[in-house]
């Protein structure tokens, strides 16, 4: 790989910064520590920004860098969103990226995310040749696959507790930002549903890219979506005493909220996106499924954030967010 700064890059002028959403202070034999702080990196246009900031929540074992660049070195969705006039806040969920983790305060982590799992999720065997937007190698040792897997870490063993932490940190970020739009990917979708549930009125809309599902799914090696779209408890009106009572009840923070689910044509996640939309609509949301092939955008899998047409896959998301901004 040549030095990136010597390649033909793009000259940009933006404002940027970083801060933390601190974790709870806990006592350990060694002293006082923080439990689960969340790192936040933000960028905004040099001169002003659209009214509502965007909060970008990465998926599964990924990190905030999922939004900032692609495995082949191009700008990711976050810089394209800034170019479109938005202020973006990119988080590293607890235990991922720059948000530190220790089992003494969070609990045990699962196995390190292996190449084989990454291949199955993002670049599976493609005998029919439909997954054209990942033209790179699919074998362990191929450069772009190395770049993608480098960002992936383990998930906490206790999926529900990790989602509670994510929801709390995102809710507190919303306290800082005020009304915002959430943009989530994959397993990060659960954190988005929960954060909106904890701060009704603070989320103007949710763009969920390839959200995990279907409702009440068992996720092998990860956990169970016991409460419909989340492993952690979600508040309903009237109150659901058990997960089985959730379907059809109003979910504060989602009720009345515009939500768009974006799916790629070659992704298995597209197969259950309509079921997620139905679940959300039954909770009072205004949900729609945006299947990219219906817009003429074809060949994308689960990682449509960083596939070769990422500059095109982000455009329907930008267009939808603009409708929320102007509502």
Functional labels for PLM-detected ranges:
Residues 201-218:
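A conserved short beta-strand
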Residues 2-49:
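N-terminal cap/lid segment of alpha/beta-hydrolase-fold proteins
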Residues 183-192:
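Gly/Ala-rich beta-loop-alpha elbow adjacent to hydrolase catalytic centers
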Residues 218-283, 288-290:
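The feature captures the conserved acid-bearing segment of alpha/beta-hydrolase catalytic domains
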Residues 126, 130-135, 139-181:
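Conserved acidic catalytic loop of the alpha/beta-hydrolase fold
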Residues 47-50, 54-132:
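Short, surface-exposed "cap/lid" segments of acyl-processing enzymes
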Residues 182-183, 206:
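Conserved alpha/beta-hydrolase fold motif
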Residues 297-327:
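Catalytic active-site module of serine/aspartate enzymes centered on a nucleophile-bearing elbow/loop
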């Amino acid at each position: 790989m040549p030095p990136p700064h010597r390649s033909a890059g793009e000259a940009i002028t933006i404002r940027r910064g970083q801060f933390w959403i601190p974790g709870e202070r806990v006592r350990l034999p060694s002293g006082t520590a923080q439990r689960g702080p969340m790192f936040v990196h933000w960028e905004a246009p040099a001169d002003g920004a659209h009214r509502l900031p965007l909060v970008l929540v990465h998926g599964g074992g990924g990190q905030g860098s999922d939004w900032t660049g692609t495995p082949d070195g191009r700008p990711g969705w976050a810089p394209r969103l800034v170019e479109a006039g938005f202020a973006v806040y990119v988080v590293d969920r607890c235990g991922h990226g720059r948000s530190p983790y220790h089992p003494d305060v969070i609990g045990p982590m699962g196995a390190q995310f292996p190449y084989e799992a990454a291949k199955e999720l993002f670049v599976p065997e493609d005998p029919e040749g439909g997954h054209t937007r990942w033209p790179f190698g699919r074998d362990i040792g191929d450069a772009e696959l190395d770049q993608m897997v480098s960002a992936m870490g383990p998930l906490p063993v206790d999926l529900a507790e990790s989602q509670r932490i994510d929801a709390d940190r995102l809710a507190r970020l919303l306290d800082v930002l005020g009304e915002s739009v959430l943009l989530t990917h994959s397993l990060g979708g659960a954190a988005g549903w929960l954060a909106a549930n904890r701060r009704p009125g603070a989320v103007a809309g949710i763009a969920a890219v390839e959200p995990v599902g279907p409702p009440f799914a068992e996720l092998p090696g990860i956990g169970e979506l016991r409460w419909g779209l989340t492993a952690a408890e979600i508040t309903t009106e009237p109150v659901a005493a058990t997960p089985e009572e959730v379907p059809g009840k109003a979910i504060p923070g989602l009720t009345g909220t515009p939500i768009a689910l974006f799916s790629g044509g070659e992704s298995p996640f597209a197969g259950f996106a309509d079921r997620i939309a139905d679940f959300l609509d039954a909770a009072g949301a205004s949900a729609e499924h945006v299947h990219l092939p219906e817009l003429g955008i074809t060949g994308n899998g689960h990682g449509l954030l960083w596939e070769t047409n990422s500059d095109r896959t982000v455009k329907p998301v930008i267009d939808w967010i603009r409708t929320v901004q102007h509502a």
